[in-house]
Amino acid sequence: MLFSEQFSQTEKTGYLNEDFRLFHIKDQTKKEFAYHYHDFHKVVIFISGKVVYHIEGKAYQLRPWDILLVNRHAIHRSEIDPSVPYERFILWIQNDILWQELLKCFQKANDRNYNLIRLNSALQEKMKDILFELETSTKSDGYGKEILTQSLFLQFMVYLNRIFLEKQYIFDKKSYTFDSQIACILQYINHNLKEDLSVETLSA
């Protein structure tokens, strides 16, 4: 596929009708994912596999338990090595949730043009514990399921914001590469999602 054609086919994917939704996925596929965007925010928690995640011109080389913040309308795609299984948690978050303070990390990721959270071992264990409890709660039919699930979601997002806003993560320049040409095209697309995004327009 030609360089400009990759971006002319950018489309909105996924629909979210609740405040948040958690997925735990493990698969092995040869499918190539096109650049796309969502109307909601997304957190990707990478567990295992060989994946390069492209967000707005940056290509992140992921390590186990890396976390990615994908702002709504941010154009992104995953580049997956099909030779090994790819396991991850995906958290979708509605833009109009009651707790707007929890969206600050996405806004800051957009401002910094940096989306990766790489944790030290102590913080990694803390976030793992909350995440696994959240997953268990979403699958439970026990008393107070909705309240417990919501409280665990809030815990996870509060800690995620603290870590990112206070820069408690490990910053490693070798963890990503940056392509200014791609970044310029994606920036144009991001500001013109309802306009003509044909190959001719993008390559003009």
Region spans (language model):
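Helical hydrophobic small-molecule/effector-binding pocket
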Residues: 94-103, 124
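Short, Lys/Arg-enriched, Trp-marked, Pro/Gly-tolerant hinge/linker segments that flank
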Residues: 113-124, 138-149, 158-204
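Ligand-binding loop in jelly-roll beta-barrel domains
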Residues: 73-98
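Generic protein-terminus/edge-of-domain signal
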Residues: 1-67, 74, 82, 99-111
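Amphipathic, well-ordered alpha-helical segments in soluble domains
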Residues: 42-45, 126, 130-133, 152, ...
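Aromatic- and histidine-enriched alpha-helix N-cap/loop-to-helix transition segments
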Residues: 38-41, 151, 180
